[in-house]
């Protein structure tokens, strides 16, 4: 480590993926010597060394890179990360930093504490698609095993311009069940509903009011993404089933109020929703107005 806040050597496992490339880009800009350990073994970014291999079964070159690293970033799916932890615990030097980028933190945090107690460990979850850019966007940070290396890495990410939000693993998963699992489920269900209604999207687009246009845009973005990423968010988060069930119950309550012709109950739902938003309602309403101004 150089200067106590800048790492000398880093291995990004799964560097060829979008998240791995984003971290690699910023690490290289910070003067860090970055090595990718990736099964693809090709398509490296500028300034990055590539070692082809599987982190679960690393060859001699991969072992040497991992052993020399100040920090290892696991930008891989959860099943791979789960197996890799024990391997890395036996290869990385004591006190080095292991950072995962998984979208669910409770399980991997427990795994790290159990299988890699000698490593400093932190979970980093960029709460945005890497293509949007990091500047000003939130990165959730779950400190598993604290130490100077973890502090240096968190400070480094903040120095890149990210808005780092630290929280415990359980809290992270509770929040992302609402932020990601419920949100994605609502948008996907909206799209499935459009398909069932057999409506022409072009006609919808031509006369769409801002809320509908925003939903169409969200649907297009998610549907154009990688299914495995969205499946992992729905399947791995322990709070996702409850989030989907809550959405379903909300639709039932809405439908019941309308079908019964009960305007008082319908109005009460609006009052309930204003209570959910609380003191943040006015600010979020202004944000929505700015978003809608840009939609046309």
From Swiss-Prot:
Catalytic activity: 4-amino-4-deoxyprephenate + NAD(+) = 3-(4-aminophenyl)pyruvate + CO2 + NADH + H(+)
UniProt keywords, alphabetically: Antibiotic biosynthesis, Oxidoreductase
Recorded metabolic or biological pathway in which this protein acts: Antibiotic biosynthesis
Cross-referenced SUPFAM superfamilies: 6-phosphogluconate dehydrogenase C-terminal domain-like, NAD(P)-binding Rossmann-fold domains
Annotated GO MF terms: NAD+ binding; prephenate dehydrogenase (NAD+) activity; prephenate dehydrogenase (NADP+) activity
GO biological process: antibiotic biosynthetic process; tyrosine biosynthetic process
EC number: 1.3.1.121
Catalytic EC class: oxidoreductase
Domain (Prephenate/arogenate dehydrogenase) ranges: 9-288
Pfam family, one: PDH_N
Gene3D superfamilies: 6-phosphogluconate dehydrogenase C-terminal like domain (1.10.3660.10), NAD(P)-binding Rossmann-like Domain (3.40.50.720)
Keyword Cell membrane applies: no
Protein family membership: Belongs to the prephenate/arogenate dehydrogenase family.
Protein purpose: Involved in pristinamycin I biosynthesis. Probably catalyzes the formation of 3-(4-aminophenyl)pyruvate from 4-amino-4-deoxyprephenate.
Protein name: 4-amino-4-deoxyprephenate dehydrogenase
Organism: Streptomyces pristinaespiralis
